[in-house]
A protein has these predicted regions:
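Short, charge-rich amphipathic alpha-helical segments embedded
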Residues: 260-284
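Hydrophobic helical h-region of N-terminal Sec-dependent signal peptides
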Residues: 6-10
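N-terminal signal peptide c-region/cleavage motif recognized by signal peptidases
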Residues: 13-15
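Flexible, surface-exposed loop/linker segments and immediately adjacent secondary-structure boundaries
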Residues: 19-155, 247
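Long, contiguous interaction/recruitment modules in multidomain scaffold/adaptor proteins
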Residues: 127-238
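Positively charged n-region of N-terminal signal peptides that target proteins for export
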Residues: 1-4
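Compositionally biased low-complexity segments at domain edges in trafficked proteins
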Residues: 94-113, 231-268
Length: 284
């Protein structure tokens, strides 16, 4: 009986290892490839979580940077190198030794929050969800994404798809009172100076046909002046000398604050976009 219990314990312990993230990808060269335990191969991308059994191939001259979640250390590998993820770290099979750096506690906390916020459903493959709805006739909003935090007092809307004939964009304040109505004449909608937006305001919005039928709806918040200033002043310049890890952490900070427009600019500078559930895909 004790032998049977030991086998059961070993089985469930192995399952736990197989489902628990071991490393968090911070940066990867364009040609770095991950192979999962099922033999599926895909590009290594920032924000991916790698589990026990993943293999990584780093070609010559390519760079691969990860956070080892158990130790809190950043490890940077330079190709040619072959790596494997074991129970609690990433192991170098062959290639130059990794360079090891500590990470600031605020960055570790942010990664922990990110993993909890964007936990990938079991069984889904990276990049399997769509970053944005496919092109088609149905009306959709590109900006502001529902729930966005705006870092400006001059909101602008960008739509895609079939615009309603003689449609209106209607804004409502936090009490549900109508704030502004703007005709939709193109995919780009801005507001005149008479629409006085203030820091810290919350809005819901609707696109309505002239006949009154609602086509689309959403919400956005304008940041407080202090929050907007803090996020904008923390901006990391996209220079050749800038570490991609620094851009990543700034993008994560913006994303978790809800400043999706600014975060998208950072993701683009890293050559990626995020799916609706926070998974990375490479920009083509």
């Amino acid at each position: 009986m004790s032998k049977y219990l030991l086998v059961v314990f070993w089985f469930f312990a192995s399952m736990a290892h197989a489902q628990t993230p071991v490393v968090f990808v911070l940066a990867a060269g364009d040609n770095v490839v991950v192979t999962n335990p099922k033999g599926q191969r895909y590009s290594a991308l920032p924000t991916q979580r790698l589990l026990f059994g993943h293999q990584i191939d780093v070609p010559k001259g390519q760079r691969f940077s990860v956070l080892v979640l158990k130790t809190g250390n950043r490890r940077v590998f330079t190709g040619p190198a072959n790596l494997t993820v074991i129970a609690d770290t990433i192991r170098l099979l062959n290639g130059p030794a990794a360079k090891v750096f500590p990470l600031a506690q605020e960055d570790l906390d942010m990664v922990d929050q990110w993993i909890k916020l964007y936990a990938r459903p079991r069984g889904s493959a990276p990049g399997s969800a769509k970053a944005r709805p496919e092109d088609g006739g149905e009306l959709d909003v590109i900006h502001p994404v529902d729930g966005s935090l705006l870092l400006t007092r001059t909101p602008q809307f960008v739509f895609k798809g079939d615009l309603p004939r003689e449609g209106n964009l209607m804004l409502f304040d936090s009490k549900g009172k109508r704030f502004w109505v703007e005709p939709i004449e193109s995919e780009y909608v801005s507001f005149p100076p008479a629409a006085k937006f203030e820091w810290g305001q919350r809005f819901t919005w609707e696109v309505r046909r002239l006949t009154g039928g609602r086509v689309l709806s959403g919400s956005f918040n304008i940041a407080s002046e202090e929050t907007a200033r803090a996020l904008l002043e923390a901006r990391i310049p996209d220079l050749p000398s800038t570490l991609p890890e620094s851009l990543l952490f700034y993008g994560m900070r913006l994303q978790m604050a809800g400043a999706y427009k600014e975060a998208d600019d950072v993701w683009a500078s890293l050559g990626i976009s995020l799916t609706l559930n926070g998974q990375p895909t490479r920009l083509r």
